[in-house]
Regions:
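Middle-to-C-terminal accessory/interaction subdomains
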Residues: 1-113
């Protein structure tokens, strides 16, 4: 898990902090069990439903996004910090849904290792 925390994205944590997190998450059975317990609580208290919330909000914003992108024709352009331009609102929502799903699955696998 420490590897996931510090290697999946850049981290400013010191090497000592990285070693401590790795030791706790990989070598301490009680900490590992507690981490799994916290993760399961998080999943059961709404995280599993995050893509449903995304879809509900995407639907709620349908008319607004339509007017917005008629006025600002930027769906096919990289703007500010966008890593990509997918060309449609539905494609952008699908990208976020896929990201959330894969991130939850990957973290779940790492926590339960």
């Amino acid at each position: 898990l420490g590897e996931y925390i510090y290697k999946s994205r850049g981290s400013a944590a010191s090497e000592a902090v990285k070693q401590m997190v790795t030791r706790i998450t990989q070598e301490d059975p009680a900490a590992k069990a507690r981490l799994i317990e916290i993760w399961e609580e998080t999943l059961n208290n709404g995280l599993r439903d995050l893509t449903t919330v995304l879809d509900e909000n995407a639907e709620l914003l349908q008319e607004s996004q339509d007017l917005n992108f008629k006025r600002w024709k930027i769906l096919s352009q990289r703007v500010h910090m966008n890593c990509q331009a997918l060309g449609s609102y539905d494609a952008e929502v699908a990208y976020v849904r896929d990201f959330i799903t894969k991130r939850i699955e990957a973290f779940d696998e790492l926590v339960r290792r």
